[in-house]
A protein has these predicted regions:
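C-terminal lobe/lid and adjacent interdomain/linker elements of RecA-like ASCE P-loop ATPase modules
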Residues: 403, 422-426, 862-944
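Charged catalytic cores and adjacent phosphate/nucleic-acid-binding surfaces used
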Residues: 1-56, 67-124, 195-361
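Extended, charged coiled-coil "arm/hinge" scaffolds of SMC/Rad50-like chromosome-maintenance ATPases
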Residues: 487, 494, 501-823, 829, ...
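Pre-NBD coupling/linker segments of ABC/ABC-like ATPases
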Residues: 253, 286-333, 686, 693, ...
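Conserved ABC ATPase signature
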Residues: 348-365, 440, 812-836, 852-860
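Phosphate-binding glycine-rich loops of NTP-binding sites
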Residues: 59-62, 110-111, 350-389, 830-839, ...
Length: 944
């Protein structure tokens, strides 16, 4: 018998294909409506019809209590248009349904055990009748038919038909057979019909409810195309998944076939068949419900629907790929590899989850880096600055001859199905801008260990700018306000100094002092305003001035007299005359006589002194008259004109007004200063609210997307929260103020400074220092106490108002499930970052991720990362290298690429169900066996 254990491999992995697992053949003993005058003609027509099928990958040839029709198709059908033919044995089991019909139960066997079915399965099935026991073999079924008809002469074909019709088995018997033969059990898939007529749902009596549940529990799958059945057995209907698993042992996938008993029905699983006025042979309005199974067309592929009943099978007319069109890489090839670490490679890629596995140095990461290289997004250096693979070979650091080279090609399929080819050589350094997001191995693990970098990256990805507050604008304004206050304070201080020269003293009330001073000037001006006073003052002034002049002349005359008295001019003249006579004897010099001049000078002095005495007497008289009028000031002061006094009054008044203006400006400036503190806080609060609002905006950013895309997005961001938080670093503020601004003799410690700003508790400890305390302290002019060093008060205000970013910040607080980043484990941080990366990518982007599980614990991978990947791959292609079995097995990777460069072998690609791939997963990945056990337990109660 030809082998049906296909040796063909499917390197692109699990893809959606049509499977029709319920097609009867001319060997059927019931409803053999296949066209043909003879049995041979029926078979010829049947084979011809099967050969015309163009888009069905797997056929299930169905026989009642045998595999006779299947064997004939295998031996004689010569079908090259299908990938696999499976034997489907249809049984009748008790109890009967409400329509008094036995329940249809199907068992699909692995072709590898077909040769053993006669001895190990059919011979083990028995049926008792009239005191005799019959096996489910052809010879015994003929005997049963003849016994039932009570005719040993009944024709063999008729007897066989009657025997098959009367043969019934039970779940108990089938369970016993499979329990005794593990190989048979492992190579069989039990499917129960759910039709009310001949299916398990036809058992309606409440007394048989447990029996009905037990039949479902025994079955792996349900034959039904009813959407309500599909939902119910997946735990998406009236019963929860947990309840379905409790009742029936596992979630059950539904499959559907054409159940063809005639040629026209083959490959046409139309649910309108049999309805009035509908003929599947001619009607164009057939409603087809094909079974689409995402798996290799192998028996192991079919078993995958048991482990992933919700994701591996669909019942619908069109391909599931049409439901979720996506951008994906269809292939990647590296040709002309010269002195490069990767040999020439050609890989088809699955459009869903592609996982790359392998040992250290096997080539799994370099394959992903080569894809990232297309966009120049590959990592150039590692954390230590060492060149990564692509750059090492690109720069020929190994000095190879000829230099390393290759041509990397890829085919990108767009959502509309159009394809575009791209290529790039090793030496080209310009990215192709292909739609993918690449996350290198060190990107996730590196950021996950740095709180600040992780928060910054997450905020940037989401579009939150925690630096949007215009700090510089506020700081410049603060400097202007403080500078103006300083100018106004200097103006006021200069005016005070001017008043001090007029008699003002520190501590006096300046307003009162100027009031008194101006009154004094006004009174003086009033006294000087009468004619008599002005004439008296003028006369005194004139006499005083004359007296001063006389006094000066008398003093000058005294000097001349002294000179004349000391002058011995005649002796000098005689000496000179002698010298002249020596030359001119006839010349004579007359003697000098100064007595007359002396007398004249003394006469002048006597007259002047007499006049001065008279002037003094007259001045005394005039002053006495003024004193009587109450005028006691110095004459010079009194002699100032009324206009001069008025000018002084105006000057003092102007200075006072300027002082008042300066004081108002100072008060206004301080109000602006205080308001600026509040504005700084308000700005921080606005930024705080901005951060929170931006995250809310991000949460709603997919509101206009499809329901499915929105649901995926919500799953991705589930548990993530970002909010703003104003951070007041009171320790930094205290540190800066204590460094030089405050007088450490008066405030020696941080505790003392806190008490000075915020106050103290009853026990003497400082109260908590808050931003409100600081704002209040500034408003109170820093407490008005002398606790600062020289320039310290000004420096403190300047620091608080212009260097506040040192101690005041707005921080974005990122949380996962309510916990801030700071308390998350490395694994939780990595998952958080990955969730954000995935949720912020565009719908067109392919995800290329290198070992995302690094630093993640297995529980976290299973509970968080695996569900995330399962959801994401529905709308995005994911290409991911990993050494974690759960990310391959329990994320149900559609394609596994085994990297084997370390042992000198090329890449091996295929599905999880591919035996060679399956072995590699178990051998290479730590926890591979356990991962498969978890997968089996996921939707099955009590599977260990």
């Amino acid at each position: 018998m030809p082998s049906q254990t296909s040796s063909k491999t499917y390197p692109a992995g699990s893809i959606w294909r049509k499977w029709d697992l319920h097609i009867h053949s001319p060997a059927s003993v019931f409803r053999n409506d296949f066209a043909g005058a003879t049995q041979e003609e029926k078979w010829r027509n049947y084979f011809t019809k099967l050969a015309t099928l163009t888009d069905i990958s797997v056929l299930g040839i169905t026989d009642y209590f045998s595999v006779e029709g299947y064997l004939k198709v295998i031996r004689e059908g010569n079908l090259t248009n299908v990938n696999l033919i499976l034997p489907n044995v249809e049984l009748r089991i008790l109890p009967v349904t409400g329509s008094n019909t036995a329940i249809n139960l199907h068992i699909i066997f692995n072709p590898s055990v077909v040769e053993d079915l006669e001895n190990k399965f059919f011979s083990s099935l028995t049926c008792s009748y009239a005191g005799d026991s019959y096996k489910c073999t052809r010879s015994d079924l003929i005997k049963l038919g003849r016994k039932y008809r009570n005719s040993e002469l009944l024709a063999e074909a008729a007897a066989y038909r009657d025997g098959v019709e009367q043969f019934k088995t039970t779940i108990t018997e089938l369970r016993d057979i499979f329990s005794k033969n593990k190989t048979l059990a492992e190579n069989s898939i039990v499917i129960v019909s759910n039709r009310s007529g001949d299916g398990n749902s036809g058992i309606q009596h409440s007394s048989l409810a447990a029996t009905r549940e037990e039949i479902y529990r025994f079955a792996h799958c349900i034959f039904s195309s009813n959407p309500s059945d599909v939902s119910f057995f997946l735990g998406l209907g009236t019963d929860s998944k947990k309840e379905v698993m409790r009742k029936y042992g596992s979630l059950k996938p539904c499959v559907h076939g054409c159940d063809a008993h005639d040629l026209d029905s083959i490959g046409k699983p139309c649910i309108k068949r049999g309805k009035e006025n509908h003929n599947c042979a001619t009607a164009a309005d057939c409603e087809m419900r094909f079974s689409w199974i995402k798996a290799d067309p192998t028996f192991e592929g079919l078993k995958q629907i048991i482990y992933e009943p919700e994701e591996r099978v669909r019942i619908q007319e069109h391909s599931p790929y049409d439901d979720k069109r996506k951008v994906f890489f269809e292939s990647v090839s590296l040709t002309g590899s010269t002195n490069f670490i990767l040999p020439s490679t050609d890989l088809f890629l699955n459009r869903e989850l592609v996982t790359v596995i392998g040992g250290r140095g096997s080539g799994k990461s370099v394959l992903l880096e080569s894809l990232a290289f297309l966009n120049e997004e590959h990592l150039k250096v590692d954390r230590n600055g060492k060149k990564k693979v692509i750059e090492f070979y690109r720069d020929n650091d190994s000095h190879s001859e000829p230099p390393p080279s290759f041509l990397l090609k890829t085919t990108l399929v767009d959502k509309d199905g159009s394809k575009q080819a791209f290529q790039k050589t090793l030496n080209e350094r310009e990215g192709l801008e292909l739609p993918f997001l690449y996350l290198g191995q060190e990107q996730l693990s590196g950021m996950a260990t740095n709180d600040e970098e992780l928060t910054k990256t997450i905020c940037e990805l989401i579009g939150i700018d925690a630096a949007e507050l215009n700090q510089q604008e506020l700081i410049v304004e603060a400097r202007e306000v403080l500078a103006q206050i300083k100018v106004d304070e200097k103006t006021a201080a200069d005016i005070v100094e001017a008043f001090k020269k007029l008699g003002y003293r520190d501590g006096e009330d300046l307003e009162k002092w100027t009031e008194q001073y101006l009154k004094k000037l006004s009174a003086q001006q009033a006294r000087l305003s009468s004619k008599e006073t002005r004439e008296a003052l003028t006369e005194i002034n004139e006499k005083t001035q004359r007296g001063i002049k006389l006094k000066g002349l008398v003093a000058e005359a005294d000097l001349v007299l002294v000179t004349l008295e000391k002058l011995d001019a005649n002796e000098t003249l005689k000496t000179l005359e002698k010298k002249i006579n020596a030359l001119y004897p006839d010349i004579k010099l007359s003697p000098v006589d100064s007595k007359k001049q002396v007398q004249e000078i003394k006469a002048f002095q006597e007259k002047a002194n007499s006049e001065m005495e008279l002037l003094r007497s007259e001045i005394r008289v005039k002053k006495a008259e003024l004193i009587k009028k109450g005028i006691k000031e110095d004459v010079n002061t009194l002699l100032q004109s009324s206009e001069a006094i008025q000018r002084q009054i105006s000057s003092v008044g102007t200075d006072l007004e300027n002082y008042r203006i300066a004081q108002k400006a100072i008060a206004s400036g301080k109000a602006s200063r205080n308001a600026l503190m509040q504005r700084i806080r308000n700005s921080l609060n606005r930024l705080n609210d901005h951060i929170s609002a931006k995250f809310v905006e991000f949460q709603g950013s997919r509101d206009d997307s499809s329901a499915e895309e929105k649901e995926l997005f919500e799953k991705m961001i589930a548990g993530i929260g970002i909010e703003g938080q104003v951070v007041f670093d009171d320790r930094e503020l205290c540190k800066q103020l204590l460094s030089w601004r405050v007088d450490n003799r008066k405030i020696p410690s941080e505790s003392d400074l806190r008490k000075h700003i915020a106050g103290q508790q009853p026990d003497g400890t400082p109260k908590g220092l808050t931003l409100d305390n600081v704002i209040g302290w500034v408003k109170a002019d820093l407490g008005g106490s002398k606790v600062f060093n020289r320039g310290g008060e000004e420096g403190t205000l300047d620091y608080i108002l212009t260097e506040w970013p040192d101690f005041l910040k707005v921080k974005a607080v990122v949380r996962l499930n309510g916990k801030p980043i700071e308390v998350l484990s490395i694994g939780q941080r990595g998952t958080l970052l990955l969730k954000v990366y995935l949720s912020t990518s565009t719908v067109r982007q392919v995800f290329i991720i290198d070992q995302p599980e690094d630093n993640l614990d297995n529980n976290f991978i299973m509970n968080d990362l695996v569900p995330l990947v399962l959801k994401t791959k529905k709308s995005r292609q994911i290409i991911m290298s990993t050494h974690n079995a759960n990310l391959v097995v329990n994320a149900d990777a559609e394609q596994v690429i085994v990297a084997q460069l370390d042992v000198g072998k090329p890449y091996l690609a295929g599905s999880i169900e591919n035996p060679e791939i399956n072995r590699s997963i178990r051998d290479i990945l730590e926890g591979g066996e356990e991962a498969f056990r978890k997968r089996q337990r996921k939707y099955h109660e009590g599977v260990g």
